[in-house]
Every structure is written in structure tokens, then in C-alpha cells.
Amino acid sequence: MGKGTPSFGKRHNKSHTLCNRCGRRSFHVQKKTCSSCGYPSAKTRSHNWAAKAKRRHTTGTGRMRYLKHVSRRFKNGFQTGSAKATSA
């Protein structure tokens, strides 16, 4: 048997499993690194030659729980909870 089509039927071991950070099935079991996000390294994996991949994972593609309110708060000067005392 050669290395072509017939031998592909014998492959049944998983080399990648689910990643704890990005959730994709890209975490290499033996290398212990994610091919998608680069986990466990502190910085998320990103390359300039993968422009489409950057577009998919960049800021603004998720919920942005905190960041979506920052522009409005900036416009008002980051006011705190206490109201200003009115001079009468």
C-alpha cells in the first residue's frame, strides 16, 4: 500500500482537540499549542498575510460588552455617579 488514497482510510487518531481560549478544534494534543489563536502564549496569534482571518477575529466581531459604551462615556467626559451640585 502506498501513501495515497488507500492509506488515508487508516487514519483515525485526532491530532487536534478543542482549544480553551478560542473554542476551535485547533489545539494540537502533542505540541500543546493552538494553531488558530496560539494558546497558551499570552498574545493572540495574528499574521499580516492572513488579512481575512484578522477580519474574522478582530475587535468588533464579538459582543464588546465594555468597549461599545466607551465612546458615549468619552463624549460626556467620563462622568462619575455623583451629580453636580447646582449653585442657586
Swiss-Prot record:
Molecular functions per Gene Ontology: RNA binding; rRNA binding; structural constituent of ribosome; zinc ion binding
Region (Disordered): 37-57
Pfam families per record: Ribosomal_L37e (PF01907)
Cofactor note: Binds 1 zinc ion per subunit.
Entry keyword Zinc: yes
An annotated GO BP: cleavage in ITS2 between 5.8S rRNA and LSU-rRNA of tricistronic rRNA transcript (SSU-rRNA, 5.8S rRNA, LSU-rRNA)
InterPro entries, per the entry: Ribosomal_eL37, Ribosomal_eL37/eL43, Ribosomal_eL37_CS, Ribosomal_zn-bd
Subcellular localization: Cytoplasm
Top-level taxon in the UniProt lineage: Eukaryota
Entry binding sites for Zn(2+): 19, 22, 34, 37
Zn-finger (C4-type) residues: 19-37
UniProt keyword rRNA-binding, yes or no: yes
Gene Ontology, cellular component aspect: cytosol; cytosolic large ribosomal subunit; preribosome, large subunit precursor
The entry's keywords: Cytoplasm, Metal-binding, Ribonucleoprotein, Ribosomal protein, RNA-binding, rRNA-binding, Zinc, Zinc-finger
Listed cofactors: Zn(2+)
Membership in a protein family: Belongs to the eukaryotic ribosomal protein eL37 family.
Other facts noted in the record for this chain: Present with 19700 molecules/cell in log phase SD medium. There are 2 genes for eL37 in yeast.
Known role: Component of the ribosome, a large ribonucleoprotein complex responsible for the synthesis of proteins in the cell. The small ribosomal subunit (SSU) binds messenger RNAs (mRNAs) and translates the encoded message by selecting cognate aminoacyl-transfer RNA (tRNA) molecules. The large subunit (LSU) contains the ribosomal catalytic site termed the peptidyl transferase center (PTC), which catalyzes the formation of peptide bonds, thereby polymerizing the amino acids delivered by tRNAs into a polypeptide chain.
Record text on subunit structure and interactions: Component of the large ribosomal subunit (LSU). Mature yeast ribosomes consist of a small (40S) and a large (60S) subunit. The 40S small subunit contains 1 molecule of ribosomal RNA (18S rRNA) and 33 different proteins (encoded by 57 genes). The large 60S subunit contains 3 rRNA molecules (25S, 5.8S and 5S rRNA) and 46 different proteins (encoded by 81 genes).
Protein name: Large ribosomal subunit protein eL37B
Gene: RPL37B
